């Protein structure tokens, strides 16, 4: 909690409160991912104190505005999360203001949560950086894995082909 309090006390109003400290302490004892997320957030915060001290001093709404100032966001203002995510592991997000959020949804998470080690390990291997225009063995492996899962309770996949897109706002 001391690490979170350092983030919380740096300056600027907090909009997103997250879980109360007693709940955070209880879950941190039960789920190592939460403790790892808090430690990672503290390390990143320490780095940001030198790199972006003015950002850290802003109110949470000001931080959001500054972080996304140079981007077109296709979502309505009330659909944008009211915090800046600093670190995350499993279902846990630690915000730039030191709040802890439980988040099990979101684009691309595939039920694996934030920063899943299996995905990081796969991405850390050398890969041909190509899209569908360049045939690649990763495409075959992906198709085989998907076809094994989709329709497995009925004996075969109901789809003849796969179509891969980015998330809706990017497609």
Task: Give short role names for the model-derived ranges.
Residues 80-89:
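Short loop/turn motifs at secondary-structure junctions and domain boundaries
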């Amino acid at each position: 909690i001391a690490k979170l309090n350092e983030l919380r006390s740096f300056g600027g109003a907090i909009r997103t409160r997250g879980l109360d400290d007693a709940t955070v302490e209880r879950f941190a004892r039960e789920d190592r991912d939460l403790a790892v997320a808090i430690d990672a957030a503290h390390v990143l915060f320490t780095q940001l104190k030198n790199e972006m001290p003015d950002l850290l001093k802003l109110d949470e709404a000001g931080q959001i505005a500054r972080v996304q100032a140079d981007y077109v966001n296709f979502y309505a203002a009330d659909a944008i999360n009211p915090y800046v995510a600093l670190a995350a592991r499993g279902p846990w997000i630690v915000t730039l203001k030191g709040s802890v959020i439980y988040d099990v949804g979101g684009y691309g998470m595939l039920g694996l949560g934030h920063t899943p080690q299996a995905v990081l390990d796969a991405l850390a291997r050398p890969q041909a950086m190509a899209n569908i225009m360049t045939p690649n063995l990763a495409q075959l492996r992906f198709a085989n894995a998907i076809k094994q899962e989709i329709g497995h309770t009925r004996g075969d996949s109901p789809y003849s082909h796969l179509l891969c897109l980015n998330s809706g706002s990017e497609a």
